[in-house]
């Protein structure tokens, strides 16, 4: 179904069965598959491919040569009906690729809302991206990677499959991330190591001085006490009881499967 207010360039192909919302604009030489749903106000600039079982929300801007919903690169993938879901108000720049999920990984690759995916960024199968994240040019995510809200991934950075990147993290450019990065941390290098707390980012997002101080203290316990994670967890948990912002560390530790960067 194509809404009567949608504008589709005559050179583009929209297969029968696709759902195209109000005010959608599809520029020249695009392809939209039969199982695609595109929400109101979204624009495909030109030469965009959206295929597979893909649902795109409202008011997204998708630039030329982006590829969304194509088959993933997992060698086990055998054409199962897996999906891609994208939220609202994302900016998906030139040559970004977002692959559909795998059965083994839950069948879904998901991108939230208000994200900026810069030129040539790659989101592999089964990745989960939160809201208000930035993936800079040529950032590459392996399969099953999770990126929490407000994280920034620098240009030319590669993240190993199954890694978790916590909220408000900043990963510097040209880094290689092979383990999980706790929330609020700045990471840099190959392999990436911690370089303190993303203080400026947290200030911009409204964290008060008391919360920043508590987060710093949790970081010091984690990285400067000379003790193991298991040894400092109880003290960080005590700190979280007094300062809610620190709870993000405790929740993150429960999710981590690859160990945290050191």
UniProtKB/Swiss-Prot annotation:
- What reaction is this protein's catalytic activity? a (3R)-hydroxyacyl-[ACP] + UDP-N-acetyl-alpha-D-glucosamine = a UDP-3-O-[(3R)-3-hydroxyacyl]-N-acetyl-alpha-D-glucosamine + holo-[ACP]
Pathway of action: Glycolipid biosynthesis; lipid IV(A) biosynthesis; lipid IV(A) from (3R)-3-hydroxytetradecanoyl-[acyl-carrier-protein] and UDP-N-acetyl-alpha-D-glucosamine: step 1/6
Q: Which PANTHER family does the protein's record reference?
A: ACYL-[ACYL-CARRIER-PROTEIN]--UDP-N-ACETYLGLUCOSAMINE O-ACYLTRANSFERASE, ACYL-[ACYL-CARRIER-PROTEIN]--UDP-N-ACETYLGLUCOSAMINE O-ACYLTRANSFERASE, MITOCHONDRIAL-RELATED
Q: Where in the cell is it found?
A: Cytoplasm
Role summary:
Involved in the biosynthesis of lipid A, a phosphorylated glycolipid that anchors the lipopolysaccharide to the outer membrane of the cell.
- Any idea of its EC number? 2.3.1.129
- The answer to whether keyword Cytoplasm applies is yes
Give the quaternary structure: Homotrimer.
* Biological process according to GO: lipid A biosynthetic process
Q: Which PROSITE patterns match?
A: HEXAPEP_TRANSFERASES
What Pfam families does UniProt report for this protein, alphabetically? Acetyltransf_11, Hexapep
Q: Which UniProt keywords apply?
A: Acyltransferase, Cytoplasm, Lipid A biosynthesis, Lipid biosynthesis, Lipid metabolism, Repeat, Transferase
Q: Which GO terms describe its molecular function?
A: acyl-[acyl-carrier-protein]-UDP-N-acetylglucosamine O-acyltransferase activity
User: In which family does this protein belong, per the annotation?
Assistant: Belongs to the transferase hexapeptide repeat family. LpxA subfamily.
**Gene Ontology CC terms:** cytoplasm; membrane
At the top of the EC hierarchy, this enzyme's class is transferase
Q: Where is the major localization of this protein?
A: cytoplasm
Q: Which residues form a coiled coil?
A: none
Can you name this protein?
Acyl-[acyl-carrier-protein]--UDP-N-acetylglucosamine O-acyltransferase
């Amino acid at each position: 179904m194509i809404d009567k207010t949608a504008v589709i360039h005559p050179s583009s192909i929209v297969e029968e069965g696709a759902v195209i919302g109000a005010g959608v604009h599809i520029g020249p030489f695009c392809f939209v598959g039969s199982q695609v749903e595109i929400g109101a106000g979204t624009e495909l600039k030109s030469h965009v491919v959206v295929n597979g079982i893909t649902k795109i929300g409202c008011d997204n801007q998708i630039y030329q040569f982006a590829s969304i919903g194509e088959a993933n690169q997992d060698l086990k993938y055998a054409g199962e009906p897996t999906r891609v879901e994208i939220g609202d108000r994302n900016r998906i720049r030139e040559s970004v690729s977002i692959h559909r999920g795998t059965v083994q990984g839950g069948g879904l690759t998901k991108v939230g809302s208000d994200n900026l995916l810069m030129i040539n960024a790659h989101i592999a199968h089964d990745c989960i991206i939160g809201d208000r994240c930035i993936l800079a040019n040529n950032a590459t995510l392996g399969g099953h990677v999770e990126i929490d809200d407000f994280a920034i991934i620098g240009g030319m950075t590669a993240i190993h499959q199954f890694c978790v990147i916590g909220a408000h993290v900043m990963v510097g450019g040209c880094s290689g991330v092979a383990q999980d990065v706790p929330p609020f941390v700045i990471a840099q290098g190959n392999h990436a190591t911690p370089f303190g707390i993303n203080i400026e980012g947290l200030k911009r997002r409204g964290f008060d001085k008391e919360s920043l101080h508590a987060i710093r203290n949790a970081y010091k316990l984690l990285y400067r006490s000379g003790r193991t994670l298991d040894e400092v967890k109880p003290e960080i948990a005590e700190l979280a009881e007094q300062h809610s912002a620190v709870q993000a560390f405790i929740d993150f530790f429960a999710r981590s499967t690859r160990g945290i960067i050191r």
